[in-house]
Structures are given as structure tokens and as C-alpha cells.
Amino acid sequence: MRDALDSVINSTLKEWECVIVNDGSQDETLSIAKEYEQKDNRFLVVDIPNGGLANARNVGIRNSHGKYILPLDSDDKIGEKYLEYAVNYLETHSETKLVYCLCHFFGDINGFRKLPDYSYQTILWQNVFFPACVYRRSDYDKTTGYNPNMKHGHEDWDFWLSLLSPNDKVYRIPDVQFYYRKHGVSMIDGTIKRLSETNRQLVLNHLDVYTPFLGDMIEWHNELLHYKGSYLALLKSPTYKLGHVLLSPLKWIRNIFSK
């Protein structure tokens, strides 16, 4: 948490406020937050019962007074110039709805995080943003906020679908200004069933967005079944079985020399 708060303090843009939401945490989070609040009046601590990440984001934003919003999770960091770059761009490009940047992993995994290029069609099927994008408070107020029914993750992806429309412009700063701490297991990691339920809830929250693609989805499903059937038929074919037999001696030799 200190890394996150220190990264805000070190920002080259000095006119900011940081609302720290303690979402029912019973560890040292609240004491650390109050420590920063006492030494810098740009910090504000809001202590609430545990209500989930989406609710915490909404509480933080609704207790803020700034023109722009940047949600920052407690274990991530921003670069020194991220706020400056993002705010300056939004100030001079009124047609742009959201600004983000290049991203670097740190923690259990270190390295550049390659994100797919943004298009509205792409974000319907996969999340192309990290949580800490910058957008206008006035645009947030036109939505219902982050949806608390996204209980097992994807709350940010769900919000981007509420925030963005097909013709909205998005800008990516061509510089690494966000550092995403990678843990061994994230909130969205878990069973296939839970992930499936989360994806289903995402679609249900945005039926108006996904309904026009229903015909395409049925066609894709049928194509997938066709390819699956072709693959299973290949596995049972004499040609495949013969190839497997012919390769067996080579695999045996490889295993000997690999010991």
C-alpha cells in the first residue's frame, strides 16, 4: 500500500486528491492510510464495512471532488508523469473518453505487459485495459458506476462497457506509466465455473450491447462444434494413429538422451 501512495505523492502533477477507501480490512491498512492522511491533506480516508471492490471504487469516486478519476489498487503503482500526461491530454482532447498507458508487471512476475490494441469490438470479447485508466468524473456520473454484482472480478471490464460507446475515442500514452503487481493468484483466478459465471454476468449487465451480436455468437458456436468434431475425427483416423506409431521410436530415443 505504501508503494501505491508514495507513487501518487511523487507524481509531477501536484494538484490531486487521493481518497483511500478501507473496505473493512482488519490488517494495518487503516492505520497506514490515516498516517498518510495526517501528513498530507490531499489524502482523505473513508472507512466502510466490506462491500467488495466495485462498491469501494464507487465510494471513493463519490467522495472525491476532482475533474478526473484514476482508480488505483493498493498494491499497484503509477509512474511519476502518468497523471500529468493523462490530464493534459484530456484537457486538450475533449473528444477522448479515456486515457491509459503502457504497463509493466512487478512482484511475482516481472516484465512488460502486452495489451491488445483497443477497439470497441475487441473490448466486447476481452478486457484490453488495466484498472487504473483516467477518465472524466462527468462521464462516470452518466453511468451507474461499478456494478457490485460482479463479485468475482471483471468489475473494471464491466465498467468500461458502461463508460464507452462505439464511437468514443481512447488514447494510449506510448510510455510505461503504470506498474501492475502480479501475484501468484489474482481475484479473477479460480474455477472454470466461477469464471464462466462472471462472464455470463458481464453479458447480462450489458444485454443491449451484446444482443446485436447474438446471430454471430450462434454462428461461432456452430463453427466451434464443427472444428471440435473434425479434431475428434482426426484423432480416430488411421492416418493419425499410424503417424503416432511411427513417431514412437523417435520419442523413445529422445527420452533416452534427455536423461
Where are these regions (language model features)?
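Short aromatic/hydrophobic "clamp" motif used to bind/position activated sugar donors
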Residues: 69
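Short, acidic, metal-binding catalytic loop of nucleotide-sugar glycosyltransferases
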Residues: 6-15
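Boundary detector for helix-to-coil junctions that initiate low-complexity/charged tails
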Residues: 197-259
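Conserved donor NDP-sugar-binding/catalytic core segment of glycosyltransferases
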Residues: 81-112
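Conserved nucleotide-sugar donor-binding catalytic segment
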Residues: 118-198
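Glycine-rich, basic loop-to-helix element that forms the pyrophosphate-binding segment
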Residues: 4, 48-64
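A conserved acidic beta->alpha catalytic loop
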Residues: 22-31, 50, 73
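Acidic helix N-cap motif at the loop->helix transition within catalytic regions
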Residues: 1-2, 27-35, 77, 81
